[in-house]
Swiss-Prot record:
Lineage, highest ranks first: Bacteria, Pseudomonadati, Pseudomonadota, Gammaproteobacteria, Enterobacterales
Enzyme nomenclature, EC number: 4.2.1.-, 4.2.1.39
Gene: rspA
Keywords: Lyase, Magnesium, Metal-binding
Annotated S-S bridges: none
GO MF annotations in UniProt: gluconate dehydratase activity; magnesium ion binding
Function in brief: Has low D-gluconate dehydratase activity (in vitro), suggesting that it has no significant role in D-gluconate degradation in vivo. Has no detectable activity with a panel of 70 other acid sugars (in vitro).
Alphabetical GO biological process terms: amino acid catabolic process; carbohydrate catabolic process
Name of the molecule in the record: D-galactonate dehydratase family member RspA
Species annotation: Pantoea ananatis (strain LMG 20103)
Keyword Magnesium set for record: yes
Family statement drawn from the similarity comment of this UniProt entry: Belongs to the mandelate racemase/muconate lactonizing enzyme family. GalD subfamily.
């Protein structure tokens, strides 16, 4: 029986990259032995902080950190109701921190505890954007020169709209020049306006241009971000077939996944789905019925490494590959959790990557190394990453509500982001 037990659980809020992050630190009775996890739900940081401080911390103190599965299962049902994104982000941070502790206890990196390496480097895809086809092409060429072989191409932010909400995206995403939205009423409610139909028609033109200019030696991806109707998603997926996308992401909203059956019958474009799911069972019918090719789990929203490894194995048995969600609004600790799973999963597909600025790398020593389109984690015990708490305190969070989620169609109707 282990003599180790949890003595303290704390949350650390910091924004060194301009994006609000939530970090969990679990301390033990062994001096210097602690674990770190990512609990970032950028849009609701204080709700997650409260869930950890007021509920999970008292629940955890005194428990053996080695009992990861038991802690996960008991914490998940301790509130009776099945968890939503707030509680699941809190639980994810706890779970990652426990795996970090277990790796440090064993003197091994987490990927060794998950079965060991299946590959030597982690292939990455990065984001490009532009106001028109030429700007997207130029941006993609720049990424290709950096060595990236997988590139996500957007023309304007999701749906062709632009935004100045820098708290979520690290750089301004311009509005597409050649998408002409329908007129709006005389008065307009606040929000980011876009035209789903005009956007859906523009994307095949974008990829026609890119394939003519860049050829087929680079893998191209696109994220619809649920900003089109299901029938338009089917039209788009079919129209994109000649351009051989690596995958089309989130063509429908989580509420409309039954449309994927019709999409699958009409198109061979590979589909990635699920960054908004918060329960691993939401993927089960999509995997069972072969409706998707890649799982887009946001590991910080589904409960951490423990459920992510299970859904990865289930996907492997059904010919589905992983593509963990990794936008700018997860901490480098969450990035490391993704990558330890990437290294140990035989059905790894691709890893999304958002470049980190110097401030992030200073606050979180041990960030993955990126070279020529591949990522490499270090071989230190645990997740291999730490936090400089004194430096983190110099980057306070802003909190508040984001504006980019307030998407509206031309007549002012609120649309899913």
């Amino acid at each position: 029986m282990s003599n180790l037990f949890i003595t303290n659980v704390k949350t650390i809020l910091t924004a060194p990259g301009g994006i609000d992050l939530v970090v969990v630190k679990i301390e033990t009775n062994e001096p210097g032995l602690y674990g770190l996890g990512c609990a970032t739900f950028t849009q609701r940081i204080y709700a997650v902080q409260s869930a950890i401080d007021e509920y999970l911390a008292p629940f955890l103190i005194g428990k053996d950190p080695a009992r990861i599965e038991d802690i996960w299962q008991s914490a998940a049902v301790s509130g009776y109701w099945r968890n939503g994104p707030v509680m699941n982000n809190a639980l994810s941070g706890i779970d990652m921190a426990l795996w970090d502790i277990k790796g440090k206890q064993a003197g091994l990196p987490v990927y060794e505890l998950l079965g060991g390496k299946c590959r030597d480097g982690i292939a990455l895809y990065v984001h490009t954007d532009g106001a028109d086809e030429v700007e997207v092409e130029d941006s993609a060429r720049a990424k290709m020169e950096e060595g990236y072989q997988y590139i996500r191409c957007q023309m304007g932010m999701y749906g062709g709209a632009g935004t100045d909400d820098l708290r979520l995206i690290a750089n301004r995403m311009v509005k597409a020049k050649n998408i002409q939205p329908k007129r709006s009423p005389r008065t307009k409610a606040p929000g980011i306006y876009f035209d789903p139909e005009a956007y859906a028609k523009s994307i095949p033109r974008l990829f026609d241009h890119l394939r003519n200019k860049l050829g087929f030696s680079v893998e191209l991806l696109h994220d619809a971000h649920e900003r089109i109707t299901p029938i338009n998603a089917i039209h788009m997926a079919k129209a994109l077939e000649p351009y051989q996308l690596f995958f089309l992401e989130d063509p429908v909203a989580p509420e409309n996944t039954e449309w994927l059956k019709m999409l699958r019958q009409q198109s061979s474009t590979p589909i990635a789905m699920g960054e908004l799911f918060v329960n691993v069972n939401e993927w089960k019918p999509l995997i069972d019925n072969k409706l998707i090719d890649y799982i887009r789990c946001h590991i910080s929203s589904i409960g951490g490494i423990t459920p992510a490894k299970k859904i990865a194995i289930y996907s492997e048995l059904n010919g589905v590959r992983t593509a963990w969600h990794s936008p700018g609004d997860i901490s480098p600790i969450g990035v490391c959790a993704n990558m330890h799973l990437d290294l140990s999963s035989p059905n790894f597909g691709i890893q999304e990557y958002t470049p980190m600025n110097d401030a992030l790398r200073e606050v979180f020593p041990g960030c993955p190394e990126v070279d020529q389109g591949y990522a490499y984690v270090n071989d230190k015990p645990g997740l291999g990453i730490d936090i400089n708490e004194a430096l983190a305190a110099k980057f306070p969070c802003e909190g508040g509500n984001p504006t980019w989620t307030m998407a509206r169609t031309p007549d002012g109707t609120v649309w899913r982001p």
